[in-house]
Protein backbone atom coordinates (compact mmCIF):
# COMPACT_ATOMS: atom_id res chain seq x y z
CA UNK A 1 0.00 0.00 0.00
CA UNK A 2 1.32 3.44 -0.94
CA UNK A 3 1.82 5.80 1.99
CA UNK A 4 0.89 9.40 1.38
CA UNK A 5 3.93 11.55 2.33
CA UNK A 6 1.58 14.38 3.27
CA UNK A 7 -0.10 12.12 5.85
CA UNK A 8 3.27 11.33 7.39
CA UNK A 9 4.19 15.02 7.56
CA UNK A 10 0.83 15.97 9.06
CA UNK A 11 1.03 13.08 11.48
CA UNK A 12 4.51 14.11 12.62
CA UNK A 13 3.35 17.70 13.07
CA UNK A 14 0.36 16.50 15.08
CA UNK A 15 2.57 14.41 17.34
CA UNK A 16 5.06 17.28 17.70
CA UNK A 17 2.21 19.51 18.86
CA UNK A 18 1.17 16.81 21.33
CA UNK A 19 4.75 16.53 22.62
CA UNK A 20 4.90 20.29 23.21
CA UNK A 21 1.59 20.27 25.07
CA UNK A 22 2.65 17.27 27.13
CA UNK A 23 5.86 19.03 28.12
CA UNK A 24 3.87 22.10 29.16
CA UNK A 25 1.10 20.16 30.85
CA UNK A 26 2.52 20.51 34.34
CA UNK A 27 2.06 24.27 33.97
CA UNK A 28 -1.62 24.01 33.05
CA UNK A 29 -4.63 23.37 35.23
CA UNK A 30 -7.36 20.97 34.13
CA UNK A 31 -10.97 21.96 34.55
CA UNK A 32 -12.37 19.84 37.38
CA UNK A 33 -15.94 21.06 37.13
CA UNK A 34 -18.31 23.60 35.65
CA UNK A 35 -20.88 25.61 37.55
CA UNK A 36 -24.40 24.29 37.13
CA UNK A 37 -25.26 27.41 35.14
CA UNK A 38 -22.44 26.65 32.68
CA UNK A 39 -24.28 23.59 31.43
CA UNK A 40 -26.96 24.23 28.82
CA UNK A 41 -30.22 22.73 30.00
CA UNK A 42 -31.73 20.40 27.39
CA UNK A 43 -34.78 19.23 29.31
CA UNK A 44 -36.54 21.54 28.86
CA UNK A 45 -34.35 23.25 26.26
CA UNK A 46 -33.04 26.61 27.47
CA UNK A 47 -32.88 28.37 24.10
CA UNK A 48 -31.73 31.64 25.70
CA UNK A 49 -28.50 29.96 26.84
CA UNK A 50 -27.64 28.55 23.42
CA UNK A 51 -24.81 30.25 21.50
CA UNK A 52 -25.64 31.77 18.14
CA UNK A 53 -24.47 29.56 15.31
CA UNK A 54 -23.84 31.45 12.07
CA UNK A 55 -21.47 29.06 10.31
CA UNK A 56 -22.94 26.48 7.98
CA UNK A 57 -19.71 24.99 6.66
CA UNK A 58 -16.49 23.64 8.11
CA UNK A 59 -13.62 22.01 6.26
CA UNK A 60 -13.16 18.65 7.96
CA UNK A 61 -11.43 17.06 4.98
CA UNK A 62 -7.76 17.49 6.06
CA UNK A 63 -8.33 15.96 9.49
CA UNK A 64 -10.65 13.30 8.09
CA UNK A 65 -8.11 12.29 5.45
CA UNK A 66 -5.37 12.21 8.07
CA UNK A 67 -7.38 9.90 10.33
CA UNK A 68 -8.53 7.75 7.42
CA UNK A 69 -4.90 6.81 6.75
CA UNK A 70 -2.70 4.59 8.88
CA UNK A 71 0.38 6.78 9.31
CA UNK A 72 -0.92 9.05 12.09
CA UNK A 73 -2.37 6.11 14.03
CA UNK A 74 0.94 4.25 13.84
CA UNK A 75 2.81 7.32 15.05
CA UNK A 76 0.34 7.92 17.89
CA UNK A 77 0.41 4.27 18.92
CA UNK A 78 4.20 4.16 19.11
CA UNK A 79 4.43 7.50 20.90
CA UNK A 80 1.75 6.60 23.45
CA UNK A 81 3.56 3.36 24.20
CA UNK A 82 6.84 5.22 24.61
CA UNK A 83 5.15 7.53 27.12
CA UNK A 84 3.59 4.54 28.93
CA UNK A 85 0.08 5.85 28.19
CA UNK A 86 0.62 8.57 30.78
CA UNK A 87 -2.19 10.88 31.85
CA UNK A 88 -0.18 13.89 30.72
CA UNK A 89 0.27 12.54 27.23
CA UNK A 90 -3.35 11.43 26.87
CA UNK A 91 -4.54 14.87 28.00
CA UNK A 92 -2.15 16.52 25.57
CA UNK A 93 -3.72 14.51 22.74
CA UNK A 94 -7.15 15.69 23.85
CA UNK A 95 -5.93 19.29 23.98
CA UNK A 96 -4.48 18.99 20.47
CA UNK A 97 -7.71 17.48 19.19
CA UNK A 98 -9.71 20.28 20.81
CA UNK A 99 -7.54 22.88 19.08
CA UNK A 100 -8.04 21.16 15.73
CA UNK A 101 -11.82 20.98 16.14
CA UNK A 102 -12.43 24.28 17.94
CA UNK A 103 -13.31 26.36 14.87
CA UNK A 104 -14.97 23.51 13.01
CA UNK A 105 -17.52 22.25 15.53
CA UNK A 106 -19.98 23.33 18.19
CA UNK A 107 -19.26 21.60 21.50
CA UNK A 108 -22.01 22.00 24.09
CA UNK A 109 -21.72 20.82 27.71
CA UNK A 110 -25.32 20.19 28.68
CA UNK A 111 -27.55 19.09 31.53
CA UNK A 112 -30.70 16.99 31.38
CA UNK A 113 -32.91 14.81 33.55
CA UNK A 114 -32.51 11.05 33.59
CA UNK A 115 -34.64 8.34 35.14
CA UNK A 116 -32.42 5.70 36.69
CA UNK A 117 -33.22 1.96 36.95
CA UNK A 118 -34.42 2.37 40.55
CA UNK A 119 -36.85 5.11 39.49
CA UNK A 120 -34.83 8.05 40.81
CA UNK A 121 -34.87 11.18 38.65
CA UNK A 122 -31.43 12.80 38.52
CA UNK A 123 -29.94 15.89 36.94
CA UNK A 124 -27.05 14.61 34.80
CA UNK A 125 -24.65 16.09 32.28
CA UNK A 126 -22.91 15.23 29.06
CA UNK A 127 -21.74 16.77 25.83
CA UNK A 128 -23.13 17.20 22.33
CA UNK A 129 -20.61 17.85 19.55
CA UNK A 130 -21.94 19.10 16.21
CA UNK A 131 -20.32 19.84 12.86
CA UNK A 132 -21.34 23.19 11.42
CA UNK A 133 -22.85 21.61 8.33
CA UNK A 134 -26.58 21.30 8.96
CA UNK A 135 -26.97 17.91 7.26
CA UNK A 136 -26.01 15.10 9.60
CA UNK A 137 -25.51 11.46 8.65
CA UNK A 138 -26.80 10.39 12.04
CA UNK A 139 -25.80 10.34 15.71
CA UNK A 140 -22.94 8.49 17.39
CA UNK A 141 -23.74 7.61 20.98
CA UNK A 142 -20.26 7.20 22.45
CA UNK A 143 -19.97 5.51 25.86
CA UNK A 144 -16.79 6.41 27.70
CA UNK A 145 -14.25 4.14 29.35
CA UNK A 146 -13.28 4.00 33.03
CA UNK A 147 -12.27 7.35 34.46
CA UNK A 148 -11.36 8.40 37.99
CA UNK A 149 -11.12 12.18 37.95
CA UNK A 150 -13.95 14.54 37.15
CA UNK A 151 -11.87 16.49 34.64
CA UNK A 152 -11.93 13.38 32.41
CA UNK A 153 -15.73 13.52 32.06
CA UNK A 154 -16.82 14.17 28.43
CA UNK A 155 -18.44 17.50 29.32
CA UNK A 156 -15.14 18.74 30.76
CA UNK A 157 -12.64 17.63 28.12
CA UNK A 158 -12.40 16.90 24.40
CA UNK A 159 -12.99 13.13 24.29
CA UNK A 160 -11.25 11.00 21.68
CA UNK A 161 -14.64 9.96 20.34
CA UNK A 162 -15.20 13.52 19.12
CA UNK A 163 -13.30 12.55 15.95
CA UNK A 164 -16.50 10.95 14.64
CA UNK A 165 -17.84 14.46 14.07
CA UNK A 166 -15.40 14.72 11.13
CA UNK A 167 -17.42 11.99 9.40
CA UNK A 168 -20.56 14.12 9.49
CA UNK A 169 -22.16 12.76 12.65
CA UNK A 170 -23.32 14.42 15.83
CA UNK A 171 -21.43 12.92 18.78
CA UNK A 172 -23.43 12.54 21.99
CA UNK A 173 -21.75 11.44 25.23
CA UNK A 174 -23.12 11.17 28.76
CA UNK A 175 -20.85 11.79 31.74
CA UNK A 176 -22.66 8.98 33.66
CA UNK A 177 -23.93 9.31 37.22
CA UNK A 178 -21.14 10.51 39.50
CA UNK A 179 -19.32 12.73 37.02
CA UNK A 180 -19.84 16.19 35.61
CA UNK A 181 -22.77 17.96 37.20
CA UNK A 182 -23.46 14.94 39.45
CA UNK A 183 -19.87 14.58 40.71
CA UNK A 184 -21.14 14.72 44.30
CA UNK A 185 -22.71 11.27 43.81
CA UNK A 186 -20.95 7.90 43.88
CA UNK A 187 -20.43 6.54 40.38
CA UNK A 188 -22.26 3.18 40.05
CA UNK A 189 -19.27 1.60 38.34
CA UNK A 190 -20.00 -1.16 35.79
CA UNK A 191 -23.73 -0.90 36.46
CA UNK A 192 -24.46 -0.70 32.76
CA UNK A 193 -28.19 -0.19 33.25
CA UNK A 194 -27.53 3.17 34.92
CA UNK A 195 -25.07 4.38 32.27
CA UNK A 196 -27.28 3.16 29.42
CA UNK A 197 -30.27 5.04 30.85
CA UNK A 198 -28.13 8.16 31.21
CA UNK A 199 -27.02 7.87 27.57
CA UNK A 200 -30.45 7.17 26.10
CA UNK A 201 -32.08 9.95 28.13
CA UNK A 202 -29.49 12.37 26.73
CA UNK A 203 -30.29 11.13 23.23
CA UNK A 204 -33.98 11.81 23.82
CA UNK A 205 -33.16 15.42 24.71
CA UNK A 206 -31.09 16.06 21.57
CA UNK A 207 -33.81 16.45 18.85
CA UNK A 208 -35.05 19.79 20.23
CA UNK A 209 -31.48 21.08 20.21
CA UNK A 210 -30.95 19.98 16.60
CA UNK A 211 -34.28 21.49 15.56
CA UNK A 212 -33.33 24.81 17.17
CA UNK A 213 -30.23 25.05 14.98
CA UNK A 214 -31.97 23.76 11.85
CA UNK A 215 -30.15 20.45 11.53
CA UNK A 216 -31.57 17.71 9.33
CA UNK A 217 -30.70 14.12 10.09
CA UNK A 218 -31.95 10.56 9.74
CA UNK A 219 -33.04 8.95 13.00
CA UNK A 220 -30.06 6.61 12.78
CA UNK A 221 -27.84 5.70 15.70
CA UNK A 222 -24.37 4.22 16.02
CA UNK A 223 -23.59 2.88 19.50
CA UNK A 224 -19.90 2.84 20.45
CA UNK A 225 -17.99 1.93 23.59
CA UNK A 226 -14.67 0.59 24.83
CA UNK A 227 -13.76 -0.91 28.21
CA UNK A 228 -16.42 0.25 30.73
CA UNK A 229 -18.21 1.76 27.74
CA UNK A 230 -18.52 -1.55 25.88
CA UNK A 231 -21.30 -3.15 27.99
CA UNK A 232 -22.93 0.29 28.13
CA UNK A 233 -22.91 0.42 24.31
CA UNK A 234 -24.55 -3.02 24.22
CA UNK A 235 -27.10 -1.85 26.77
CA UNK A 236 -27.82 1.30 24.76
CA UNK A 237 -28.33 -0.85 21.67
CA UNK A 238 -30.72 -3.11 23.57
CA UNK A 239 -32.77 -0.19 24.91
CA UNK A 240 -33.02 1.43 21.48
CA UNK A 241 -33.97 -1.76 19.66
CA UNK A 242 -36.51 -2.82 22.26
CA UNK A 243 -38.09 0.44 23.43
CA UNK A 244 -37.41 3.30 20.98
CA UNK A 245 -39.11 2.52 17.65
CA UNK A 246 -38.55 6.07 16.36
CA UNK A 247 -34.79 5.48 16.28
CA UNK A 248 -32.93 3.01 14.06
CA UNK A 249 -29.76 1.40 15.35
CA UNK A 250 -27.49 0.99 12.32
CA UNK A 251 -24.28 -0.23 13.94
CA UNK A 252 -22.82 -1.33 17.27
CA UNK A 253 -19.11 -1.22 18.11
CA UNK A 254 -18.04 -2.67 21.47
CA UNK A 255 -14.46 -3.34 22.54
CA UNK A 256 -12.83 -5.09 25.49
CA UNK A 257 -15.72 -4.82 27.91
CA UNK A 258 -16.42 -6.44 31.31
CA UNK A 259 -19.66 -8.00 30.09
CA UNK A 260 -19.89 -10.47 32.99
CA UNK A 261 -19.09 -8.39 36.05
CA UNK A 262 -19.49 -11.19 38.61
CA UNK A 263 -17.12 -13.42 36.66
CA UNK A 264 -14.63 -10.55 36.38
CA UNK A 265 -14.70 -10.16 40.18
CA UNK A 266 -14.15 -13.93 40.56
CA UNK A 267 -11.25 -13.81 38.11
CA UNK A 268 -9.54 -10.99 39.98
CA UNK A 269 -9.99 -12.68 43.37
CA UNK A 270 -8.77 -16.03 42.05
CA UNK A 271 -5.65 -14.47 40.53
CA UNK A 272 -5.21 -11.96 43.38
CA UNK A 273 -4.62 -9.32 40.75
CA UNK A 274 -6.44 -6.48 39.04
CA UNK A 275 -5.28 -4.43 36.07
CA UNK A 276 -6.71 -1.20 37.48
CA UNK A 277 -5.98 -1.26 41.24
CA UNK A 278 -8.98 0.89 42.17
CA UNK A 279 -11.41 -1.00 39.91
CA UNK A 280 -12.69 -3.56 42.42
CA UNK A 281 -13.00 -1.00 45.25
CA UNK A 282 -14.88 1.30 42.83
CA UNK A 283 -17.04 -1.67 41.83
CA UNK A 284 -17.93 -2.46 45.44
CA UNK A 285 -18.94 1.05 46.44
CA UNK A 286 -20.51 1.74 43.04
CA UNK A 287 -22.64 -1.40 43.27
CA UNK A 288 -23.60 -0.44 46.81
CA UNK A 289 -24.77 2.96 45.55
CA UNK A 290 -26.52 1.64 42.45
CA UNK A 291 -28.44 -1.08 44.31
CA UNK A 292 -28.80 0.81 47.63
CA UNK A 293 -26.96 -1.93 49.55
CA UNK A 294 -25.41 0.40 52.14
CA UNK A 295 -22.20 -1.63 52.20
CA UNK A 296 -19.59 -0.50 54.70
CA UNK A 297 -16.04 0.16 53.54
CA UNK A 298 -14.70 -1.40 56.77
CA UNK A 299 -15.96 -4.81 55.62
CA UNK A 300 -14.06 -4.65 52.34
CA UNK A 301 -10.99 -2.40 52.49
CA UNK A 302 -7.71 -2.44 54.38
CA UNK A 303 -5.68 0.59 55.29
CA UNK A 304 -4.44 2.80 53.81
CA UNK A 305 -7.28 2.57 51.25
CA UNK A 306 -9.89 2.36 54.01
CA UNK A 307 -8.76 5.60 55.63
CA UNK A 308 -8.19 7.47 52.37
CA UNK A 309 -10.96 6.13 50.10
CA UNK A 310 -12.94 9.37 50.16
CA UNK A 311 -9.86 11.42 49.32
CA UNK A 312 -8.33 9.12 46.70
CA UNK A 313 -11.43 7.82 44.91
CA UNK A 314 -14.66 9.52 45.92
CA UNK A 315 -13.27 13.05 45.60
CA UNK A 316 -12.86 12.51 41.81
CA UNK A 317 -9.56 14.42 41.98
CA UNK A 318 -7.34 11.61 40.74
CA UNK A 319 -7.19 9.56 37.55
CA UNK A 320 -7.08 5.77 37.83
CA UNK A 321 -3.37 5.92 36.97
CA UNK A 322 -2.74 8.37 39.78
CA UNK A 323 -4.67 6.19 42.22
CA UNK A 324 -2.61 3.20 41.07
CA UNK A 325 0.57 5.13 41.79
CA UNK A 326 -0.73 5.93 45.27
CA UNK A 327 -1.78 2.35 46.06
CA UNK A 328 1.45 0.86 44.68
CA UNK A 329 -0.13 -2.59 44.35
CA UNK A 330 -2.16 -4.62 41.87
CA UNK A 331 -2.83 -7.37 44.44
CA UNK A 332 -6.34 -7.46 45.89
CA UNK A 333 -5.05 -9.12 49.06
CA UNK A 334 -3.10 -5.95 49.83
CA UNK A 335 -6.04 -3.54 49.51
CA UNK A 336 -9.06 -5.69 50.43
CA UNK A 337 -9.99 -7.61 53.57
CA UNK A 338 -10.33 -11.39 53.66
CA UNK A 339 -14.07 -10.85 54.17
CA UNK A 340 -14.34 -8.71 51.06
CA UNK A 341 -12.80 -11.48 48.98
CA UNK A 342 -14.97 -14.26 50.43
CA UNK A 343 -18.39 -14.71 48.82
CA UNK A 344 -19.58 -16.87 51.72
CA UNK A 345 -19.53 -13.83 54.02
CA UNK A 346 -22.93 -12.15 54.31
CA UNK A 347 -22.03 -8.65 53.13
CA UNK A 348 -19.85 -9.93 50.30
CA UNK A 349 -22.66 -12.27 49.27
CA UNK A 350 -25.07 -9.33 49.05
CA UNK A 351 -22.57 -7.49 46.87
CA UNK A 352 -22.01 -10.54 44.67
CA UNK A 353 -25.72 -11.18 44.21
CA UNK A 354 -26.10 -7.64 42.89
CA UNK A 355 -23.16 -8.16 40.52
CA UNK A 356 -24.97 -11.11 38.98
CA UNK A 357 -27.71 -8.73 37.87
CA UNK A 358 -25.22 -6.52 36.03
CA UNK A 359 -24.06 -8.76 33.20
CA UNK A 360 -25.27 -8.25 29.65
CA UNK A 361 -24.74 -11.73 28.25
CA UNK A 362 -27.25 -13.19 25.83
CA UNK A 363 -28.47 -10.05 24.08
CA UNK A 364 -28.28 -10.50 20.30
CA UNK A 365 -28.12 -7.19 18.40
CA UNK A 366 -30.00 -6.94 15.12
CA UNK A 367 -27.70 -4.40 13.49
CA UNK A 368 -24.20 -4.56 12.08
CA UNK A 369 -22.09 -5.44 15.12
CA UNK A 370 -18.34 -5.41 15.65
CA UNK A 371 -17.04 -6.97 18.87
CA UNK A 372 -13.34 -6.50 19.59
CA UNK A 373 -10.94 -7.69 22.28
CA UNK A 374 -7.21 -8.27 22.50
CA UNK A 375 -6.41 -11.73 23.80
CA UNK A 376 -3.45 -10.09 25.57
CA UNK A 377 -5.59 -7.58 27.49
CA UNK A 378 -3.99 -6.73 30.83
CA UNK A 379 -6.96 -4.90 32.38
CA UNK A 380 -10.23 -6.53 31.29
CA UNK A 381 -9.92 -10.34 31.25
CA UNK A 382 -10.43 -11.68 27.73
CA UNK A 383 -12.72 -14.40 29.11
CA UNK A 384 -15.43 -11.68 29.16
CA UNK A 385 -15.56 -11.60 25.38
CA UNK A 386 -15.36 -15.39 25.15
CA UNK A 387 -18.44 -15.64 27.35
CA UNK A 388 -20.21 -12.93 25.36
CA UNK A 389 -19.49 -14.75 22.11
CA UNK A 390 -20.74 -18.05 23.54
CA UNK A 391 -23.91 -16.37 24.80
CA UNK A 392 -24.88 -14.82 21.47
CA UNK A 393 -23.42 -17.22 18.91
CA UNK A 394 -25.87 -17.41 16.04
CA UNK A 395 -25.76 -17.73 12.29
CA UNK A 396 -26.22 -13.97 12.14
CA UNK A 397 -23.68 -12.76 9.60
CA UNK A 398 -24.06 -9.17 10.83
CA UNK A 399 -21.94 -9.91 13.92
CA UNK A 400 -18.14 -9.78 13.58
CA UNK A 401 -15.86 -11.06 16.34
CA UNK A 402 -12.34 -9.65 16.17
CA UNK A 403 -10.33 -11.38 18.88
CA UNK A 404 -6.56 -11.53 18.40
CA UNK A 405 -3.28 -10.70 20.20
CA UNK A 406 -3.46 -6.93 19.73
CA UNK A 407 -1.40 -6.04 22.80
CA UNK A 408 -2.35 -4.42 26.07
CA UNK A 409 -5.71 -2.86 26.90
CA UNK A 410 -4.46 0.63 26.04
CA UNK A 411 -2.62 -0.41 22.87
CA UNK A 412 -5.70 -2.24 21.65
CA UNK A 413 -7.87 0.81 22.38
CA UNK A 414 -6.00 2.79 19.71
CA UNK A 415 -6.46 -0.04 17.23
CA UNK A 416 -10.17 -0.29 18.02
CA UNK A 417 -10.79 3.44 17.65
CA UNK A 418 -8.88 3.47 14.36
CA UNK A 419 -10.80 0.45 13.05
CA UNK A 420 -14.18 1.94 13.92
CA UNK A 421 -13.32 5.39 12.57
CA UNK A 422 -12.11 4.02 9.25
CA UNK A 423 -15.16 1.74 8.94
CA UNK A 424 -17.84 4.38 9.50
CA UNK A 425 -19.02 6.01 6.27
What are these regions (language model features)?
Residues 5-6, 14, 20-105:
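N-terminal targeting or regulatory segments adjacent to alpha/beta-hydrolase or S9 domains
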Residues 266, 347-354, 379, 383-425:
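C-terminal catalytic histidine-bearing segment of alpha/beta-hydrolase fold enzymes
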Residues 189-211:
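Alpha/beta-hydrolase active-site loop
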Residues 370-377:
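Short beta-strand/loop motif that positions the catalytic acidic residue
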Residues 90-133, 138:
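N-terminal cap/lid segment of alpha/beta-hydrolase-fold proteins
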Residues 134-137, 145-172, 177-183:
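Short substrate-entry loop that stabilizes the transition state in hydrolases
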Amino acid sequence: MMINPKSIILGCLLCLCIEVLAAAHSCTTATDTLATTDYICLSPLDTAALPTLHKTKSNMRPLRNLLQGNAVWDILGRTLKRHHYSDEYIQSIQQTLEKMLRKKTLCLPCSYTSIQPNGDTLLLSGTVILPYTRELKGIVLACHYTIGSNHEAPSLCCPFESIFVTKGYAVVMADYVGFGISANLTHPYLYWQSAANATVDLLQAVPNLLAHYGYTYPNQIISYGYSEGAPVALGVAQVIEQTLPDWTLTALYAGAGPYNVAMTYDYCVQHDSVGIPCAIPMLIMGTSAGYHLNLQKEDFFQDPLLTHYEEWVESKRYTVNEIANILQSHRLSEVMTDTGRDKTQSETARFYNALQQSDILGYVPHCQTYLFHSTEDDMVPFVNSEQLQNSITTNNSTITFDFAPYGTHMAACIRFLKQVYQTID
